[in-house]
Amino acid sequence: TALQLNKYTVSSERLPRAFDGCKIAHISDLHNTEIGKNNETLLNMLREAKPDIIAITGDLIDSRKTDVAAALHFAGEAVKIAPCYYVTGNHEARTSEYDALKTGLIKLGVTVLENEKTEVERAGEKITLIGVKDPSFSSDYLFHDEEAIMESQLKALVDKDDGFTLLLSHRPELFDVYVTCNADLVLSGHAHGGQFRL
């Protein structure tokens, strides 16, 4: 499995000065893949990047070959590098082992966000981090469209007074919904290589 590090610089007048230079490592869709034995290649890349935050946006496990222990090993090492924030993907919704994964992540110190928000503080200033559960967890998933489910989830979380807001959600195709919630930055996965391919 090839591993590539992409670096992006995000600028916003809404970002508190204390977050200038803040590094976020974004990991998504590992699907229980090991990049190097016990994910050491990936973990070494994370260590070298020295992130301030690690965002994991779903599909840490694969519903066809779920290995909770491998996922927890990766998360346990990642949380030693930087605070980790995790949201679910569609593969977590498809397995009966999600509760074991969630419990293990929490025990390791990973912040699991299921339609919740939290604050990240740095030098006395704060940003809001919102994490939404994948729509496929909803009991209405078969009867309602994903946009309606996501809109409902976000409506309860969004507050225009929250300041700079970072949204973690597995699904990039719901970006039109995210725009309406005033998120300043959205991190998502699911697309395995991008929304646009040439």
Enumerate the predicted regions with their spans.
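Short, functional N-terminal and low-complexity linear motifs
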Residues: 10-12, 42-44, 68-73, 142-144, ...
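Hydrophobic residues on conserved beta-strands that form the core of alpha/beta folds
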Residues: 5-7, 27, 129
